[in-house]
């Protein structure tokens, strides 16, 4: 049986950003949007600014449910308490970076992510699948990322859910390495990198969704 989430006008939209340290970010350093050092905080700012330009009454909140060092198995275990209890409309799922660091099989990682997508659908939450960003300094860990990302896109297509290519958004197109301009330490992103992810998610998914409610 196909589960098709129903999209309808709403006065408030809640999004949970679910993942590991790439979701946690560095910290929220202040009220200045230029200082946002996590993609969820910057994404919320972009959404509210966009709606303000349309004079829309819709309110958007992006709840950060990242856990540093988490694996996809851990994300699966805590999905109910960290995501379902929030009763969000959408959940952005970004996981697998740490699994690859522990040399886990990309197919196993994809299985865990698939179960998270299904758990969201079963709870009436729309999942947004994200590919894993690249790395700088350990080229041998780029191919498993590419394999995992192909599986992520395939699993998203099977479920007719959106997928966002954060690898392409932050990688050097010539080397497939994490772009130096977005890298903090080769694995984690700097402030510019987290803002890039927030902007990419907004431009490639959230903007069009908000426009439906701002009319």
Where in this protein do the model-derived segments appear?
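Active-site segments of SGNH/GDSL-like serine hydrolases
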Residues: 94-98, 114-150, 173-174
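Alpha-helical structural signal in soluble globular domains
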Residues: 42-50, 82, 115, 119, ...
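Serine-esterase "nucleophile elbow" of acetyl-processing enzymes
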Residues: 1-65, 80-87
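Short, solvent-exposed loop/turn segments at secondary-structure boundaries
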Residues: 28-33, 103-107, 139-143
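Solvent-exposed loop/turn segments at secondary-structure junctions
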Residues: 21-24, 67-72, 97-101, 133-137, ...
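Structural recognition of the beta-strand scaffold that forms the well-ordered cores
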Residues: 15-17, 23, 61-66, 90-94, ...
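Catalytic His-Asp segment of secreted/periplasmic serine-dependent ester chemistry enzymes
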Residues: 134-215
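Internal alpha/beta domain cores that form substrate/cofactor-binding pockets in large enzymes
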Residues: 16, 46, 56-86, 98-127
């Amino acid at each position: 049986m196909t589960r098709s989430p129903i999209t309808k006008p709403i006065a408030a939209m809640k999004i949970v950003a679910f993942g590991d340290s790439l979701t946690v970010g560095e910290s929220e350093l202040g009220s200045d949007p230029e200082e946002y050092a996590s993609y969820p905080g910057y994404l919320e700012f972009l959404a509210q600014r966009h709606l303000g330009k349309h004079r829309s009454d819709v309110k958007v909140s992006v709840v950060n449910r990242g856990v540093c060092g988490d694996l996809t198995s851990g994300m699966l275990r805590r999905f109910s308490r960290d995501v379902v209890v929030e009763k969000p409309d959408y959940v952005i799922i970004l996981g697998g970076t740490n699994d690859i660091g522990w040399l886990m099989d990309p197919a196993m990682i994809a299985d865990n992510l698939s179960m998270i997508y299904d758990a969201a659908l079963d709870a009436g939450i729309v999942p947004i699948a994200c590919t894993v960003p690249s790395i700088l300094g350990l080229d041998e860990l780029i191919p498993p990322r590419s394999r995992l990302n192909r599986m992520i896109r395939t699993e998203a297509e099977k479920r007719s859910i959106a997928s966002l290519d954060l690898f392409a958004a932050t990688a050097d197109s010539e080397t497939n390495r994490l772009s130096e301009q977005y890298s903090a330490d080769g694995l984690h992103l700097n402030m510019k990198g987290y803002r890039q992810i927030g902007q990419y998610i907004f431009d490639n998914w959230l903007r069009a969704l908000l426009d439906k409610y701002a009319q």
